[in-house]
Amino acid sequence: MNRLKEKYLNEVVPALMSKFNYKSIMQVPKIEKIVINMGVGDAVQNPKALDSAVEELTLIAGQRPVVTRAKKSIAGFRLRQGMPIGAKVTLRGERMYEFLDKLISVSLPRVRDFRGVSKKSFDGRGNYTLGIKEQLIFPEIDYDKVNKVRGMDIVIVTTANTDEEARELLALLGMPFQK
């Protein structure tokens, strides 16, 4: 069993139970899924850019991403409906915990001038979104093979009803929030 999942079951659940006075263990918020999205704007002019993005996302997530397509045509961006413009991957279960563990303990500390992640990025429904400016912070990405620095969005979806519960859950799991 994953180290983070073990920590969740043995330490986080009892701590949250006592803090928020839940009646049942099923009320304790848990992480449902993690969605990693990579928008590749230059895929419009250069379709090969998408292939490298998909490859990098596969390495990062350990799972093959799905290619996202344009919903509408936008003339200003020379975009037609249905053109591939990005990639996203949804992690659940073991892979999700492995990714989160790696993100918290290895990748985030590698960000330049890292002072912690923002406390304001909750959406009011107990989900947390975090943007990453470059994919090089992940240990799986080989610096020499990268042709372009790309960012990505990471959404952590929890079953928490309020932001406060979600913040507490992530903080207990080790998410480095700003002081």
Swiss-Prot record:
GO biological process, one term: translation
Pfam families registered for this protein in UniProt: Ribosomal_L5, Ribosomal_L5_C
InterPro entries (UniProt xref): Ribosomal_uL5 (IPR002132), Ribosomal_uL5_bac-type (IPR020930), Ribosomal_uL5_C (IPR031309), Ribosomal_uL5_CS (IPR020929), Ribosomal_uL5_dom_sf (IPR022803), Ribosomal_uL5_N (IPR031310)
GO molecular function, one term: tRNA binding
Keywords: Ribonucleoprotein, Ribosomal protein, RNA-binding, rRNA-binding, tRNA-binding
Function: This is one of the proteins that bind and probably mediate the attachment of the 5S RNA into the large ribosomal subunit, where it forms part of the central protuberance. In the 70S ribosome it contacts protein S13 of the 30S subunit (bridge B1b), connecting the 2 subunits; this bridge is implicated in subunit movement. Contacts the P site tRNA; the 5S rRNA and some of its associated proteins might help stabilize positioning of ribosome-bound tRNAs.
Binding partners and assembly: Part of the 50S ribosomal subunit; part of the 5S rRNA/L5/L18/L25 subcomplex. Contacts the 5S rRNA and the P site tRNA. Forms a bridge to the 30S subunit in the 70S ribosome.
Family that this chain belongs to: Belongs to the universal ribosomal protein uL5 family.
HAMAP family for this protein: Ribosomal_uL5_B
PANTHER family: 60S RIBOSOMAL PROTEIN L11-RELATED
Name recorded for this polypeptide: Large ribosomal subunit protein uL5
